[in-house]
Design a protein with these regions (language model features):
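Serine-esterase "nucleophile elbow" of acetyl-processing enzymes
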Residues: 1-55, 61-65, 78-83, 89
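Alpha-helical cap/lid subdomain in secreted, periplasmic
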Residues: 2, 46, 70-179
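Active-site micro-motifs of SAM-dependent methyltransferase domains
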Residues: 13-14, 57, 97, 141
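A general secondary-structure junction signal
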Residues: 54-57, 135-137
Length: 179
């Protein structure tokens, strides 16, 4: 049986391309030859099944009044149940949690990620086969690239997520990667 890897994230996991001229297909989403999840699948080979679960705007625990259904927390159990069995759960979120409207900081975002990790561990379908969890700090927002929902504090917040997530991974006995 193949080993199953579920990748849950935001636009980075979805493959959003904000400049269609950068995409091979000139579309708003990178194609299967460009998305990191597809590249991971290709690198791992046929013994693995990499499942994409990316949504632009997705947050760890915040409801966004301007975007429907982007809060992962209320749907996490359903996603995990629908994709089980899993060998590895990859969570790469936090960028959208740094939006100015949420008035947050790196520690609060890490607490949101911790809630997700603990919820993921509590899903009854695992039994004794709980998947490993990899917490990935997303690439920080670049300085000077400020979208309407982000400001300089958002840039600094996303830069500090790697440190917070590394501590969290140790506390939760998970793994960590700084993208």
């Amino acid at each position: 049986m193949k080993k199953h890897i579920l990748c849950i994230g935001d636009s980075n996991t979805h493959g959003l391309c904000t400049d269609p001229s950068e995409s091979a297909d000139h579309g708003s989403r990178y194609n299967e030859e460009e998305r990191w999840t597809c590249l991971l699948q290709k690198a791992l080979g046929e013994e693995y099944l990499v499942i994409e679960e990316g949504l632009s705007g997705r947050t760890c625990v915040y409801d966004d009044p301007d975007m429907d259904s982007v809060n992962l927390l209320p749907i996490l159990h359903a996603l995990l149940n629908s994709h089980e069995p899993l060998n590895l759960l990859i969570l790469m979120l936090g960028t959208n949690d740094a939006k100015t409207k949420f008035h947050t900081d790196p520690t609060k975002i890490a607490v949101g990620m911790q809630i997700l990790v603990e919820e993921a561990k509590s899903v009854p379908c695992w039994g004794e086969n709980e998947p490993k969890i990899l917490i990935v700090a997303p690439v920080p927002i670049e300085e000077g690239v400020i979208y309407p929902d982000f400001n300089e504090k958002s840039v600094e917040t996303t830069k500090a997520l790697a440190r917070e997530y590394a501590f969290l991974a140790v506390a939760e006995q998970g793994d960590f990667l700084d993208a």
